[in-house]
A protein has these predicted regions:
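Short, contiguous strand/loop micro-motifs
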Residues: 21-23, 77, 128, 193-194
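Transmembrane beta-barrel wall of Gram-negative outer-membrane proteins
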Residues: 1-59, 85-87
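C-terminal/domain-terminus segments
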Residues: 52-78
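Flexible, surface-exposed loop regions and adjacent strand-edge segments
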Residues: 2-12, 16, 64-74, 121-130, ...
């Protein structure tokens, strides 16, 4: 079996032989994940929390693409996801009451920002293709419940979401000097994966759930 020794900065015109087929050459990557929760007990019946998440990675080579063949030869010199970045922020407010139609409830807001890219180049070509997507997701959830009596309980709520996607794509030729990538030619636009002028999607839903305890069994 053969593998590609190419990278962002290294140019290798031909595949190299993999002496140990049990090792997936040039497919390692690094990833950082941070997670933190905060909780504020306002009083006995009110609670506020905050969920924070962040992750980032190095380039992530896609192994199934790097071993794909065409006419008996490796097809791709490069195929990797660019650094995948994700930020998540979600505050939540909880309340506990003795009202007739509300024993407990919570409101949850969510914001998420995701960014990733796809990069590829064929063997025998100096042209690298770049596709990038940025996604923003907003959401608001409401969940409430109460007991009508000992046998009847209800839960109800809603969810609203809004998603916004922005896509960018271009290609450029690499400038090579002794197997080193020293720069690139001017970028040329290519078709994007999603509408380049931004696209969005929204949804809204409500629900109600009734539990009737017929007997102890």
């Amino acid at each position: 079996p053969f593998y590609s020794a190419n990278s962002r900065s290294q140019f290798s015109p031909v595949p190299l032989e993999n002496e140990n087929p049990l090792i997936q050459k040039n497919t390692a990557y690094d990833q950082l994940d941070l997670f933190q929760k905060f909780l504020v007990q306002i009083n006995e019946k009110r609670q506020l929390s905050l969920n924070l998440q962040y992750s980032n990675s190095s380039d992530i080579p896609r192994y199934d693409k790097l071993v794909e063949t065409r006419n008996g030869n490796l097809r791709y010199a490069e195929w990797y996801y660019g650094p995948q970045k994700r930020l998540f922020l979600s505050p939540q407010y909880k309340v506990f009451t003795d009202k007739k139609f509300l024993n407990s409830g919570r409101l949850t807001f969510g914001y998420q920002h995701v960014e990733e890219s796809r990069n590829s180049r064929d063997f025998g070509s100096l042209t690298r293709q770049y596709q990038r997507e940025k996604v923003k997701v907003f959401s608001l959830n409401g969940d409430f419940e109460f007991d009508l009596d000992e046998k009847h309980s209800f839960s109800y709520g809603f969810e609203g979401t809004y998603n916004k996607v922005r896509s960018l794509a271009y290609q450029y030729d690499l400038i090579i000097n002794q197997n080193k990538v020293e720069g690139s030619a001017p970028r040329l636009p290519i078709p994007t994966r999603y509408p380049s002028a931004k696209s969005s999607y929204g949804s809204f839903a409500i629900f109600i759930n009734w539990v009737w305890d017929l007997n102890e069994n």
